[in-house]
Every structure is written in C-alpha cells, then in structure tokens.
Amino acid sequence: GHGISNTFHELPNILHYGKKNTGLEIYPGMTFTIEPMINAGKYNVKILNDGWTAVTKDKSLSAQFEHTVGITENGYEIFTESVKGYTKPPY
C-alpha cells in the first residue's frame, strides 16, 4: 500500500509483509491504503516496465484487494468499506 494525501501515491510505502511491532508507527490523521496480495505460488513479485503492474515472479495466479484506511483518535476507519456491509455492487 501507500500513503494518501495531496497526491494519490505518497510515502509511506506499506509493504505486503512484515513482523508484528517492527513496522511504521501509525498515529491519528494518517491515511493510507492496505493492498494485500494472495498468491497461488510464492510471495515474490516484480514490477513490470510500466512502473505499476505487480506480477508474481513464478508466474502463478494472484489476486489483490485494496482498502483505504484513516487512523482516528479511537482506532481506524475503513473509507472503502460499504456502509451497508455489502460485499458487491450496489454498495
């Protein structure tokens, strides 16, 4: 994932992996995306020449989903989650 502010893709970079309590410190007011990848094969990925598209190095099938999250004084808010709890259109 990535930070979101005045422009769409900003720091910090939010990695697809990590160890608990070793990453970025988050605090109220931060807004960023979480973009997990689920791969049929290994976790290794590469970015294509367009600078955007991520593919698995072993060419296995992969799916990616994105949520935009805001950190609040009391926790977090998922901005891209359906208010009605729907998982498919109409949201």
Predicted features along the sequence, with ranges:
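Short, basic/aromatic beta-hairpin or loop at an interaction surface
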Residues: 1-14
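Charged, cofactor-coupling segments
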Residues: 18-91
